[in-house]
Amino acid sequence: MKFTVSSSSLLSLLATTGKVISNKNTLPILDYFLMELKGSELKVTTSDLETTLSGSITVDAVGSEGTIAAPAKLMLDSLKEFPELPLEIEVNDQNWEIRINWKSGKLSIPGASAVSYPAVPALSAEHREITLDVDTLIGGINKTIFATADDELRPVMNGVYINFAPQLLTFVGTDAHKLVKYEAKTETDLTASFILPKKPANLLRSVLLREEEAITVGFDSKNAVFKLKNHTLVCRLIEGNYPNYNAVIPTANPNKVLVDRIELVNGIKRVAVCSNPTTNLIRMDIGENRINLTAQDIDFSVSANETISSSYDGQEITIGFKSTFLVEILANIETPTVQIELADSTRAGVFKPVYDDEQRSTTLMLLMPMMINA
């Protein structure tokens, strides 16, 4: 195995695929990059047995093809120290030594045989397949992933639920305290769903930022495959039935507030400094053209209050929210103005972005209230 490659191109590929590698691998070989050279294409694969990511680049001056397992940390640490320059990489097929040569020096890294590297799971013959544009997939993941849980007892809530329906694609994330539903119009007639784990969802976010072409998504009952231009991600899906999220979204919300999002976020942050550190409770008294924010910590005799101007249609209402969740919800809405819909102090608040024109997607965020002590 022998070829020449740009140092920056190789580092970029290894850094991206290296995000899969776990700090607690059960198999020593999983601490390695699987590097395969066929023709002028260098393919690099990493896996943690649950998620597998591969990427490829074009290399020059190919002397011979081959496959090797290269130690991930050593390869990354070495390549980070190089400026942009051509590297000649040669592998000794007898002892798996990896030699990296450049204009003014060389280094040697011990590799390993790739024979024991785990095979990539294959989809069943009954798998489904769909093509999605980058903006739809990255938009759905970005909007919902922050609301997913870390709950060993309810693993189905630890991922992003993706539901395909005729002309509509829905992404949902929830941890039982907050819920986000993102819907986008599509041109598919597919009816299916799966739960994407958090780790591959985050990996897709980072890889998709550099993609422009459409993505092919294939899946069966156990695994999903995301095929991009230069990368392929294969992951095991979360098994189980996702909660009926539509049942918890209140539909009759007569009280509606329009408020400047940044002004509200900044007000919450200032007032929340004086909230109880255990509950982070912040009280919202909503009335005509104003939202009054209050927080206090009785144990330390501290309190804060601020009034935010708003446009309000409804009855006066008092409701409590966890300030950290409230800030998180508002931080994931990108419009200058946000609409808050409320039924009463015991039901969830619904948060929606306010757009100036019609959108191909809609976002709904829900936050459960907290009890306010009289």
Language-model features: locations:
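Structural preference for solvent-exposed beta-strand-turn elements
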Residues: 1-374
